[in-house]
Amino acid sequence: MLRCRSSINILQLHSRFHTHEIIISSKESEARTRITDEERLVIKRFPIFKNDSSYILPSSNKLTKVKKEHIALKIHKIKKLFGEDPNNVGYLNYHLPKSYPVPFEINNRAYDNSDGNGENEKVRNRLSVTKLLTKRWCELREAYDIYSETPLFEHKQIIEGKLVHQKLEEDIHPVTEDLESFVEDFEVPIPTDNFHNHVDDLFSCSMRLLSLFRCGEAREVRCHAFLDSRTGTFIDGLPKDGKDVLVSGIIDHLSLRRKIRVFTSSGFTEFNGLNDEVFENGNNFQSIIEWLNANIDFLKSEYQINVSDVKTRMFRSVVSQKSVLKYSKYQVMYYRYFLELLGLHPDVTYGQLLNSSLSRGFNIDQRIDPAKVIYFMASDEVIVDDMRKLRDGDDIGFPPFDSDFTGSSPTEEEYDMSILSDQITDPNVLERYGEFLVPWKRPVTLKYFAARLAQMYNCISPLLSKHLTLEYYYKGDNFKNINFDFNEDEIRNGAFDSSMFWFGKRDIEPIEPTSENLITYCKYCDYVNVCSWRQKATQQKKELGPRLLKLNQN
């Protein structure tokens, strides 16, 4: 496999875009979900630990102590909020609490402790793509989990899935030896605070979109859209107010492919990107973007970008539940749709990226630490020419960004890279970057990285294929792919239905109480033995036989 030059950020190996955290051992996993001593005292008073048969845990003989405590705490919290079903004593009510905030506010309020300086990575006014899939399993289970406000329990399958994702990512975006050596030997501390890590995410996403053309693949690519909570529809412009909610996700796999495979006497030729063509006029953003825009008609006729999602399995088989498969497809459709929206108008996307950064609590005008700028140039020389332009006060060729400096007076605080001159003595570093260790006419801010990322989204959007893929992996082996087509109407309807739930415009819609569903969906649910919806359905089925028999006798 061709290993792409777009590398993983060596300074953030512990966190891929703040989502794919790698847990090495089950002990560490338990530590993340370990319950406090105070909570443990509360739990010991629960009926679940007093031999109350109505609170028996699902498959309790197979659960660890930590998992049992985790479930018990959730049930305790939900019972306090939802109360018991008045028509089914001992079981949980399955209607949204009328006197309590709607699901979105519950999901959102956990993020209200940001200090305004970006020191909290949680995002206000946001949903993830997976949060739109409320009916993937059972919406009632989803609602209980939301209102319990309890962190996700990371079981073995989640941990192994993250490891598979990391391995796939490193295969395409390895940490280069040159960058490892640079970071190890660099004499100036490279900042890794939340703000600089966020900027790193923007830079890394641009590099991954470039890697589509360098080597034909990219993994772990960020995308987003804004959902109007009033109408349940996605907008294609800038958010107007707090009612437009950020929905974000990370795409597992993008691949650039020929529309028609090339066959020679030795068989089909392997496609490894368009590195020679795209970079023939120089390895810098402006020339690359200009080439892609100038050749877009040719590219559309010959190539397409496929969007895929990776699903890891504990067995060599795909999911059997129809709703799980349906909403897994929706997930990929959302990703593809978001990329399409992001590519429509680069100036709008630029504004959205800035808005997204603001929602994370970051100052979009904050200057990037000079050591981080050197690190970015060492990571990929594609930005070196842009850094020269900013240093010299020249435009980079993207008007929405360049206009910030048009007719402006010198900034109150000079952006001075010369402060590193006395700290850097390595002759190799001075030879490569000495020209930048001077006062700059324009500062490097988050806005620059948002600008180039917006342009890259615009370059790939026209190439998006209607054909999408679910990739199934077992122990690192891609044993099955499911191909399907993009359907915009389906995800528009799905987003509308999900938003009605999140913003409290409809009640919870539990899974259909068929015999098959009660077995395949409910068996391993944390709430299986306190769920009134399930208990009523089960009881009705038990009574159905005698009722039919009685009718027959009459």
From Swiss-Prot:
Q: Which UniProt keywords apply?
A: 4Fe-4S, DNA-binding, Exonuclease, Hydrolase, Iron, Iron-sulfur, Magnesium, Metal-binding, Mitochondrion, Nuclease, Transit peptide
**One Pfam family from the record:** Exo5
Q: Does the keyword Mitochondrion apply?
A: yes
Note on cofactor: Binds 1 [4Fe-4S] cluster.
**Subcellular location(s) per record:** Mitochondrion
The EC designation for this entry is: 3.1.-.-
What is the transit peptide's residue range? 1-17
One Gene Ontology cellular component:
mitochondrion
* Superkingdom of origin: Eukaryota
Q: Which GO terms describe its biological process?
A: interstrand cross-link repair; mitochondrial genome maintenance
| Names of the cofactor(s) | Mg(2+); [4Fe-4S] cluster
Q: Which family does it belong to?
A: Belongs to the EXO5 family.
Record function comment: Single strand DNA specific 5'exonuclease involved in mitochondrial DNA replication and recombination. Releases dinucleotides as main products of catalysis. Has the capacity to slide across 5'double-stranded DNA or 5'RNA sequences and resumes cutting two nucleotides downstream of the double-stranded-to-single-stranded junction or RNA-to-DNA junction, respectively.
Complexes and interactors: Monomer.
What is the protein's name according to its record?
Exonuclease V, mitochondrial
Q: What is the lineage of its organism?
A: Eukaryota, Fungi, Dikarya, Ascomycota, Saccharomycotina
